[in-house]
From Swiss-Prot:
Residues 49-167 form the THUMP domain. It is found in: Cytoplasm. SUPFAM superfamilies: S-adenosyl-L-methionine-dependent methyltransferases. NCBIfam families: PRK11783.1. It comes from the Bacteria. This is Ribosomal RNA large subunit methyltransferase K/L.
Amino acid sequence: MNTSLRLNHYWITCADGLETLLQEEIEQLGTKVTERKAGRLIIEGTLEHAYRICMWSRLASRVLLPIHTYELERTHDARDVAEELYEGAISFDWSLIFAPQSTFAIRLHAEREIKVNTQFATLRVKDGVVDSFMEAVGRRPSIDTKQPEITLYVLAGKTEHTYCLDLSGDSLHKRGYRRFMTDAPIKENLAAAILQKAKLQERNPEIVLDPMCGSGTFIIEALMILTDRAPGLVRRFGFNGWHGHDRELWLSLKAEAAERHEKALEQPLPKFYAYDADWEAVKATRENIIAAGFEKLLGDIQIEERTLADWPDFGAENKTAFIVTNPPYGERLGDKASNRSLYLGLSALLQKNFPNQYAAIIAAQIEQADVLAFEAPETLRLMNGKLPIYVRFGTVKPEKVTQPFLANWQAQPVEMEEAQDFANRLQKNMTALKKWATKENIYCLRLYDADLPDFNLAVDLYGDRLHVQEYAPPKKIDPEKAKKRFNLALAAIRAVTGLNRDAIFIKTRARQTGTNQYTKQSTANKRFIVQEGKAKILVNLTDYLDTGLFLDHRQMRLRIAQEARGKHFLNLYSYTSTASLHAALGGAASTTSVDLSNTYLSWSKENFVLNGLTVDHADEQHMFFASDCFEWLKEGHEQYDLIFIDPPTFSNSKKFHGTFDVQRDHVSLIKRAMNRLTSEGTLYFSNNYRGFEMDEEIEALYDVEEITSETIGPDFKRNQKIHRAWKIQHPGLN
């Protein structure tokens, strides 16, 4: 059955989740929405209304004019649907819509209940249109699937098939400016929807920042909104070959849009910042901005290759800022853990640089969005193609200015009948360390380390949490007696520090052999962030015997941070690569971290991402290798200016053939590493083996200086044997 053509009835399609925003936009354009369905709005209006939506809608996907409805009288199977679509197509005189010399294409969509081979059914619709032309005028149009002059949109339904003329031609999200692509881009209409949901124009910002700009979509869409630039001003449409096209009407709307844009350009614009860690993305952004027609505005747009760790001083204290970005989730980054660290790092940067300013951040998982520190957050779920995304909107909370725990701690009288000596010693240590920790901003330090023989434990402070390690008692000590003493010590720790039970994490530490330190102790996975120098570091006080941060090497890491600028840094037995992190934040030209454990290298990458540094091997700035260090040194030839080696005392990993003994093997290890050290470079070698002696061969071959005293902080002065460290250089430098 053929229904007559109505020029006041249109379908406006959109991505799932945009229906409400699209309805608001359409009604602002002066058109009434009469019906709303998932991914589609139906309007009643004139051809001018449809043209205005084509010209001005930033959110719509397509503007469709239903021109023919074929009502069904049969039940469905796959073959019936295709034949019905053919019958529906041939039953309409398509020569009334477009000329046979025009090219056309078919876009077929089926409702969920309809099972049909869309490729075959599309061919049958094409056959029906062509056969209709042959019957009507004796000539047939040609198919062009890439740039057709006419696009027919067909919806296969349960009771009827609807044939529409696609006035938009190509999807309206294609504005015509995207000349260069990056991985996992955001569609233009979704970017515009996010900006409109965030009320960009009403906020009238002085700064617009996209710190991970990709191909520049957010920056360009913001420019279009703030300069009143119609998204359809310079693109092709699907109505030019339509017999019903009103060319004069369209040209008048186009002239009106151009005039509005020129007038808006006379108004002051915010300063735009478009950053990305990938040079190709920076290049794509610049080229796309030019392609969008904003070349004259490049002076107002700072487009630079920058990581999150390399933000400038925006001078935003007294300015209104708007931050929007599509972080490299999923395809653009990798595992969920690294993604979460990225959002934690971004949130911290926003709190520091843009407190009380408005932001809109895309996330692939809701858990990523949840770590963003926003006041009164709102979340919008959208579909970016087939990929669900979550957009978190909100005002950035101000940064919490924290001081080291000891800065605010005050000694109080403590009475502990059976553990008074321990309580007094712990309090004495904390009092002695308070001034140093406060002055140097030390957040993580050792408070007690088996100072008294009856209390054989270590107490470490990580931020505002305690890590208490009970050293395994000698066999001659009664286990019940040892347990009682440990419980007394815990009570004293709570009394002296004032910390609750949930801030104290307890482990038993035995002598380490092989890879015990890498054995998981629990599955709690409760990691949190601590500060050391410029670095934010993830620590875990529950899952492993070691926490992810060796406190005794703090001074060495800070030394590396001071010496690393402009240098190529190598970290062997890197563990969670905190030394590499300090080197990177200190301005190292590159860092390379080598460790046998994939678990700790993954943790390493999270530390880097948390601090806004890239971990993509493609740029070769920060590299991570899961390898035996001996083999890795043997296979490569790259030279390094600064090398740090902190090997285990002993190792017999399943991944490593044979064993490693630091006393036995340090000569060959150091010699291989020195072969990779530049002529004027420095190698730092350290280990925790109390009986270690540097071999005379190393002292004969190189300039060797023991610097142990320089690498032990005040919190470890009570235990001078915690580690030993040497500075090693090629002969003749001193």
